[in-house]
Amino acid sequence: MSQTASFFPFALLFKRCLLGVFLACAAGPAAWAQTAAAPASGTPGQTPSGHGFVLPKDWTQTRRGDAVVLQAPEGGSWIALVEAEAGDAAQAVAQAWTAYAGRPPPPLRLAVPLANANGWVGGHHFLYRAPAGEPRQLSARALRSGGRWVVRIDDLAAAVAGKRQADLNLIGDSFVPAGHVRESFAGRKAQTLDAGKIEALKTFLERSRRSLEVPGLSIGVIQDGQVVYRGGFGVREHGKRAPVDADTLYLIASNTKSLTTLMLAKLVDEGRLRWDTPVAEALPGFELADADATAKMQIRHLVCACAGLPYRNLDWEFAPANSPASIVFDILARMRPTSAFGASYQYTNPPAAAAGYVGGHVAYPELELGAAYDRAMATRVFEPLRMARTTFDFDRAMRGNFARSHGVGIDGRIALVDPRRDRQMHAVRPTGGAWSNVDDLLAYVSLELNGGRLSDGRRYLPEAALRERWKPQIATGRDAWYGLGLDTDMASGTPMLFHGGRLYGQRSNMVWWPEHGIGVVVLMNSSTGNVLMDAVPRKLMELAFDAQPEADSMVAAAAANERATREARRRDWGAPARRGHAAALAPRYRNELLGELRVERSRGEVRFRFAAWDMPVASRVGAGGAVEFSGAIASPPYPFVAGRSAAGRTLTLRDAQNEYVFTEAP
């Protein structure tokens, strides 16, 4: 996120998407990993031709003819691995669906190329329409090795996919061709990132930025305690001339979590708090919707993505403007675990926001929760690290040198995102509401690389206290785990720590390799830059280790994916909303948790207005004939589905594990 992570689990952040068996946390040379308990690994398996995969714990494996079928513990959700003799990807996928389900593939929504990775080349990803009224994720990946095809089919209930992301990661990244040997940097020394290598990085960045239509990108690279590059590419706002640079402020979204847990680590070192302090002890009155979970919940459980609490964003996204910090605890009081403590990686935002506010309350109990958090972050993090430009104040940030948020409209053009959308983050700011820049975040990455020492050599935090946050709390995939607001990936044989961030129209990532003294911060002002959260660190590894060239393939596949996605949206959606669809809408709807939705019409345009923001909507006919509405720019990740109930007309909004019904109101 997980991405983080980070705010939308359907497109997980950076290397959180790595999949595979989670080996014992003691694997690899990192001493800090050796001290942690190892999450359970899965069971190795093979297809008939010897392509390897790992079956996650509690999943079952069966054969349906030529298909190896893996079933999730909940039942009704499957992954199928099918070898196929075919001339192309589409034929291979058709054969695979027949072998798995005895029928042709479902109606196709989109087909896009896949980047070459893990020994597979020339792959394609097929995305399908789910049946009416059945929230499912249906897709097929046609992968090729040695001229032969193998297909992975995902046939998953949306709720299962939401809570089993780490298991899906485990299956996916462990799935490699027979005889494939994974690339490893273990025991290797990184090369100096000299002027020639930096020039190659800059060329890659500018070419990629243009290919992906990212208006502005800022980056900083550090090696062995020295900043070897800092700068910007492009502009702060599409169509304008003001450039971005290393001082430009971006909304860093979930990267804020890592800064929040640094503040908590400082409080632990001061003796004000323990990671195992019960939350209800630190903040009397704290409660979840489940009494047993409330009693078990410790400070670390709020920031480990390991407490079984599901993704839940819409409560605060649809809240009134300028909602107080206390809204976080109102949301948590409605939440209950959907998996046991420590059983499943579930990346979610309200608990992490609560962690920051609890820390602020412990430090400054006399202040309002939000003010206390802001003060704790200023005194424990921003001031000591000299992060002078980093702020939670949107008004202060959005003056002068800052990057405007951009998305893609239904017409396929880059467009500004309404800033009111991202301002909703202020109420839950410990989980994702900081504005920062390359220079300030390099100071933070330097602290992590220096084991808790500031750039002038002074001790900020004992190394053990700093690295407590690095220790595994829950498996996220192959040799990968989530700690306390930080991800770690050991798949390359050397630890890579990171966290990503994503909000409407903003993307960010910070990554460091502690064994090699290398770190990078990359910030972007467009949703179209997703792949660069992964591809930029990959490019650095190619330059530092002469690694296999994959970064360019990643960007090329992502650019093709973006073009196909835009074309599909133009084809499927009518913007503004089609007249007949709009005419069937009620003037006003209400949901008891998300509040009021008003339908406004002006000059042929239809807008949905909520408590703090509004958006123009497009419409289409979905599966089974239901009319669906979506924001024309920066929509919630799932459409509003029109329907009827005994109470009148309805609009239903579903995320992975939650359903919200807006009902016609007088």
Task: Mark where each language-model region is.
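Short, conserved catalytic-motif segment at the N-terminal edge
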Residues: 193-252, 272-274, 281-282, 288, ...
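Short, well-ordered beta-strand elements
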Residues: 79-82, 146-159, 509-512, 516-526, ...
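Short, solvent-exposed loop/hinge segments that bridge or flank secondary-structure elements
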Residues: 66-71, 571-610, 643
